[in-house]
Amino acid sequence: MKGRRVAATVLAMLFLLTQRAWAVDISATAAVLMDADTGRILYEKNPDRRMLVASTTKILTALVVLESCELRSTVKVTQEHMAEGSSMYLKPGEEVTVECLLYGLLLASGNDAALALAEACGGVEPCVRAMNRLAGRIGMTDSHFENPNGLDGEAHYSTARDMAKLASYALKQPTFLRICSTTTAHVGGRTMTNHNRLLREVEGCMGMKTGYTKAAGRTLVSCVEREGRTLVAVTLQDGNDWADHRTLYEFGFSRADAAETAAACGRKERFWI
């Protein structure tokens, strides 16, 4: 009898967790929550809608640079590297290491850093070609990029699902992860603070990338690791992105915990979408 009461209590708790998890309400036009290790989608909202992704593009730019450039190599900044929008405030004539530019790209979201790094890859056009090749290798089947900084373009788009695939791939690159998880960097005579508030506000956040243009709205890619599980969240065109990412992680990790408890009780409940 006692065992039955315990089992009933556990099942009631699992039911409440499931009900709570299903009640996800976020503001994003498109979103995905993915298990980075398995690729399983835990939550989705318009996951395959082609959308502008703004500076979250820079995740892909950084990965291309890390595949083709040495961190200690330098780039001489020119007037052509000056760009509208967010900046790490490069000055024509200065020489900056690729590593410093990567911090400027991923923390300060510098559009100037993106163009300078593209130069290190042979120029903007070769860099963009490499970005699209890498996107294809990753399995981003509904994406196309036409610049390294994420500024709006008719042929520059991705989906929440594809961006989650990109983030999961990026987690396997230790240098990328080291840089994007840094809250404040002092490098190359500069101090740069990461735009990603989740690093300071969400337990286990490992970073990733923010983005914004007027047309794209707010875009955000993030990742969180807890007790050996890593989840990736993507929201596109989301004016409430910080709160929505917290909601998605609470949802995702709660469902994972519920599934584990069910397994421990010998039940085969399905707690994933």
Locations of the language-model features?
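Non-catalytic cell-wall polysaccharide-engagement segments
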Residues: 3, 130, 254
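Sec-dependent N-terminal signal peptides of Gram-positive bacterial secreted proteins and lipoproteins
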Residues: 4-22
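Amphipathic, positively biased hydrophobic alpha-helical segments used for protein targeting
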Residues: 14, 42, 50, 72-73, ...
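Active-site-adjacent loops and short helices of periplasmic peptidoglycan-processing enzymes
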Residues: 18-161, 165-172
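Domain-terminus/edge residues, biased toward the C-terminal soluble/receptor-binding domains
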Residues: 140-141, 152-273
